[in-house]
Amino acid sequence: MSIKASGGSPLARPQLYRTASILTITQAEQQDRFLQLGELNQLVSFLNSGQKRLEVADILTKNANILVARAADKIFVGGSAISYLERPQAAVIIAGDQSSQDKINELSGNIQGDFGQSFRSLFNAGGATPPGFKPINVLRYGTTRMRKSLRDLDWFLRYLTYAIVSGDPNILSVNIRGLRELIDNACSSAAAIVALREMRRTALLIFEEDIKGQDLVKEYFNVVISEFEAPSLTDKLRKRISGDLQGLRLPQTYVQAGVSTPRFVMKPSLSADEKNIVVKACYRQIFERDIAKAYDLSLSNLESQVKNGQISIKEFIRSLGTSSIYRKQFYEPFVNSRALELAFRHFLGRGPSSLEEFQKYFAILSSTGLSGLVNALLNSSEYTDYFGEETVPYFRNLGEEPQECRNWGPQIDLLTYSAPFRKVPQFITLFSDYKQSLPDQHPYGIGNDPLSIQFGAIFPKENKDPRKRQALFGKDTRRILVRRGPGIYNQISNPQVRPKSAGSLGPKIFKLSNALIKSDSSQNFENSVEVVTKVAYLRVFGREVYQEEKLILKPIESQLKDNQITVREFVRQLAKSSIFRSLYWEPLYICKAIEYIHNRLLGRPTYGRQEINKYFDIAYKQGYYQVIDTIIDSSEYTETFGDNTVPYERYSTPAGVALRSLRPGIIDQRFKKVIASKSARFVELGTVKEMRSSNDIQSRISQGVTSLRDQSIVFEVNSDSNKEMLEQALRAAYRQIFERDLNSFSVGGEFLDIKSAFLNRQICVKELVEKLALSELYGKEFYQPYPNTKVIELGTKHILGRAPNNQAEIRFFNQILASKGLSAFISNLVESVEYNAVYGKDTVPYRRFPTLPAANFPNTETLYNRLTKQDISIVVPSFKKVLGNQ
C-alpha cells in the first residue's frame, strides 16, 4: 500500500457493550418503526427493576472486600492475601469503621501455616473442584503476581455490578470470554474458577433473606463462570476472491458488543405484516427511506409479485435499482464516480475496495449505464455469498465485519445518513492520491498551520472544504519552507549562514548592540530599548500589549533597561508569562500551540513529525516551560539570533507566501482597477460645471412638477357642511371608489339606502367608503374579474390613494384575501393606521402622490393613468430586493 495518502480517520466509536434499553430501542430505530407492545413491556420491566438492581449493586460494592477476601483465601495459603489488594481498586471502607475491618479479618482468618484447614475447606464449599487445581503459596507466588491476582478478582466483581445495573449480561460475555487462555499463561485458570465459585457462594449468603436479589446475583455469577470456562471465540474472517483486495479479520467481541444489523429474509411462510416489513426494508436500503411512508409512493405491482413469490428479493432489488425513482435520486444529480460509490452502498453495503475494482465497474457504468451497473453488482459472486436470493442487502459497517484500512475514512463516511448530500467523489480521489506525491501541508493537518499574518495565532478551519485530503506523512518527511531572502542562504543546504542577514531582501532586524549600550548617550540607549521592547511584543504576542498587561511586564522591561538580562532572556520571560500562556497555550490544542510558539520564537514553522514529536514528548513529560527553554536554548536560536537580536521571520510556508502576494494570475482581468475618488460620487455629479441664468435655474426647479399638485381638491365633511356639500362629497366618493359617477346609472336600493344614510348624517365618510367598497357592484367590477394581486392594487388605489408599497405588503394582503375574502381585506384597509392618520373619519380618499417626490410615485402614476377596463395587467413594484421589502 502507498504511504503517500490516507483515507483519513473520522471519529469511530465502536459499541463496547449492550444494555437492555439500548438493544430494544436500537432494533426499533433500525427498522424505522415505533416500539411494539412487547418491547415496551421489556422496557417497563427493566425500569421497574431498576431500584432493585441498584440496591443489589450497592450491597455488592460495600461488601467487595469481603467477597474478594473469601475468594482469595480459597486459593492462596501461607499469608494474608487480602493485604495485597490495592486500595484504589478496592471498595472504599469508611475510615474508623472498625466493625467492617474486624469482619474482614474474621472472614480472612489467620491461615499462615494452617495449610490443612484451608485445603479441607475446599470440600465444604459445594461443587466439584476443577481438575489441576492446587492451592497457591503466597510467599512463592510473589508480591507482583499477588497484586495482579487480587486486582483481577476485584475486576470480575466490578464488571458483575456493571452488568447488573445495565440489565444485560452482554458486558460480561464481551470482556470475559477468552480470558481463560490468558490466565493459563500467567498462573492457573482452575484457581480462578475456584475463586469465582467461592465469590458466588459468599454473595448468595449475603442475600440469603432476599430471594429476588439472590436470584439476580446467581444469574449473573453463572454467566461470569460459564463465560470464563468457555473457549475463546475465533476471529471473523473476510475472505477475498481477488489479489488486489485485502484479507481481513475481526475479533468476535466487536460483533457481540454491538447491535447487529437486522437481516430481513423473505420466506413464503411469513405473514402479510412480516412481508410488508421486508418490503419496507428494501425501500430503506435502496432509497434510504421508506418511500411509502415519506412520499406516499409504492410500486404495487412489484410488491405483489415479491409477496406472492413470483419474483425473489434479489429481482425486486434489481427492479428498484433500475426504476425511475432511483435514477432521479441517486444517478442523475451526481457524476458517474459518485453514482458508482452510492450504488456500492445501496447494493453491496460497502464502498469500493480498490482502484482496480473501481475501474472495472466504472467501465460498466460508462458503457451500459445505470441498469448495467446494477446488474453487474447483483450478479456478482459477492452479492450471492452475502445476500443470496432472499436476503435484503444491509450495511456491512464497523462492528458488522472487518474494515479495510486503505479506504477507512471514505468507507465510514459513505455509510452515514448524509452521504447522498455529498456531491464530490471520495474513493477515486483517494485512490488517485495513492500515486501522487505528498502535498505541501502540515503533517498533522493543514489546520495546524497558522495564517501568515501579523496578529496572533489564527488557524484556518478544515471543515469549510468538503474535498479535504489526508496524507500519511512519515517521520522522515520534511516540509518545503520558503526562505525570506536569497535561496542560497537556506539553512538546510548551508547551515553555516544562519546568522547571516538577508539584507534588503529579508525582514527588518532589530538588534540591541553592545556599542550602543556602552555609549555615553543615555537618550539613544533608552530609545533603542523602547524600540526593541515594542518589536519584541509584536513578535511574541502578535500585537501590542494593553496598559494593564504592561504593568505585569514592567519588571521584565526594567531588567532589560538596566542591562540585567539580554534580549534572549527577555523573549524567554515573555513566552513564559501568564499573558502569552493564556493566549496561545491554554485555549489551543498542543499541536497548534507548539506550531505557533515555534514559528514565533524560531522564526519558522516546524519541518515535520520528527521535530514536532520531540516537543510533544517534552510538553507531556516536563511541561510547558521546558518547551520554551528547549526552543530558546537550541543551537539554531543561538546561531541565528544570539543574545541581543529580536527573533524575526526567516521561513514561511508556500501558502503563506501566496497569501501575502497579489499574483496577476488570481486577478480578474475583465475589469480594470477602479481608483477610488477622493470626494463622494454624489458631490462630483452634483457639481455645476457651467454658468446658468436665473430663468434656467427657475425652469430646473419646477422640473417634474405639474399643475396636478395645485389643482387637487380634498373633499371634507364637517358639522357646518350643508346638503349640497354632502352631495359633492358623496359624488367624490363614487368617483374615487368606482372611478366614475354613478348618477347616470340605474342603481338598486342598496345605494339609495347608503346615500340616504349619508345625507342624513347617520354614517360618516369613513363608513360611507367602507359600505361602497363592500357593495355587490364593487365586487362585480373590481374583485371577481381579477386575480388577488390586481385586487390588492385596486384596493389600495381606491381606499388609500396609492399603489402598494412593496412585495411584503402585497403578500400580507394576499394572505387576508385568500383566507378571509374581500370583506376582511376592505375592513383591514379602512381600519388601518395609515387611513386614520391621512383621511380620518370625514375626508374622502384622494390620490396622495400626484407629483414627485414620492417613494412609490412611478407605480402610483402608472396605476392612475391606466384605464382599468382596457388593461388588466398587474403593476409590478419597481423596488429593489432588500431586507424588509420582500
From Swiss-Prot:
InterPro entries: Globin-like_sf (IPR009050), PBS_linker_dom (IPR001297), PBS_linker_sf (IPR038255), Phycobilisome_asu/bsu (IPR012128), Phycobilisome_asu/bsu_sf (IPR038719). Keywords: Antenna complex, Bile pigment, Chloroplast, Chromophore, Electron transport, Lyase, Membrane, Photosynthesis, Phycobilisome, Plastid, Repeat, Thylakoid, Transport. Disulfide bonds: none annotated. It is a peripheral membrane protein. It is found in: Plastid, Chloroplast thylakoid membrane. Its main location: plastid. CDD domains: PBP_PBS-LCM. Contains one covalently linked bilin chromophore. This protein autochromophorylates (Potential). One of its GO terms (molecular function) is lyase activity. Residues 244-424, 496-678, 695-876 form the PBS-linker domain. (2R,3E)-phycocyanobilin binds at residue 187. Pfam families: PBS_linker_poly, Phycobilisome. Its EC number is 4.-.-.-. It comes from the Eukaryota. It is an enzyme of class 4 (lyase). GO terms for cellular component: chloroplast thylakoid membrane; phycobilisome. GO terms for biological process: photosynthesis. Belongs to the phycobilisome linker protein family. This protein is postulated to act both as terminal energy acceptor and as a linker polypeptide that stabilizes the phycobilisome architecture. May have intrinsic bilin lyase activity. This is Phycobiliprotein ApcE. It comes from Pyropia yezoensis.
